[in-house]
Amino acid sequence: MQKVKAIGRDEPPARPSHWRANRRATRRVAPTLIAWIFSVLLVSQAAAVELLDDRVITIHSTRDVTAKRQALIKYVWGAEGFPKRRLPDMVVTNVASPVKQLADLARVDEFRLNMAPGLQGLAYHFIAQHPNGELVVLHHGHGCTFDDDPGPADVGFGLQRTIAALLREGYGVLGVFMPHKRPGDCTGGHDAMFQMTNVIGSPIRFFLEPTATSLNYLKTQSRAGHFPAYRAFHMVGLSGGGWTTTVYAAIDPTIQCSFPVAGTIPLYLRVGGSIGDREQFETTFYAIAGYPDLYILGAHGKGRKQVQILVRRDTCCFGQRQHDEKAAGMPYAEAMRGYERQVRNALAGLGRGSFRLEIDETAPGHMISHHAIEDIILPELQSAPR
């Protein structure tokens, strides 16, 4: 039985008539082609972008950690602060699963959040048949469906296989979409969001609020919503979702383990397709905390860790193909290991938390591979302190 609960402002969870057509069209286009088109568009704007040099780490104490996190929250949300009490505007329970072939699924709930005129956040709560009491946020990037290839080969973006593996191990999954990258609204247009007027704080808030408000609901409404009372929260994201994972884990220390996949590298190493959309390089934001600082914030704390996964043969961004060895002064892996070493040393000085970089040598393109899921993400989750 389906139950609709309007928590805040009313807006029906309507699915326009073109929704199914968009969904079918998205599935017909090979993800590698989508990644290639996306990278070409990014390269075309690269020459006009001047990136901040973020190679210097500015966090040296726990006081710095607190101050940086507070400064980021103030930048993103202004005087309103982090939305720690806001819930989704609408919750629809027991919806048809948007992802096929999930053997260990008990139920799916749908969350919708009205963020601005014409801008609605969407997330799905996949409840495991045999819950282990923990939940993983899985954040998509520049794709509009989680229902990609379910097979044993490394095909597609890897969202379906990630959900299936997490459910198999008993983890609840919160699947979250980027702004304007969801069923019913696959228009993109992230750069245009930074031209919006009357935004309190920064448009970056629209990338983070669907996760924040959905987690608020999951942390407080288990009895009323008839779902497991989760005791630990983790996060995985691909591409733009990997960027979201990096930033969200830096801001919200309740994320214990985080796994940004093909999502970011420091700005000083970026060229071409690795530059990304505006949220990836907005100077006023990264002047507060560059990427190495964000990695520290996302990993620092008792029992916290961040494992960043890059794909060597990435067809979009942050792989060897997108690396400028001449500009960096060193080969791809050496350059990546350089910032990993800096972040690890800084965390060692702070005394709590761990950071590690994995370069996926098996994935043939822009994706979460079976290797990343089975040999990196799941073992790290299962070994996390409890």
Enumerate the language-model features and the residues they cover:
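N-terminal cap/lid segment of alpha/beta-hydrolase-fold proteins
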Residues: 88-130
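The feature captures the conserved acid-bearing segment of alpha/beta-hydrolase catalytic domains
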Residues: 266-349
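C-terminal catalytic histidine-bearing segment of alpha/beta-hydrolase fold enzymes
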Residues: 331, 337-386
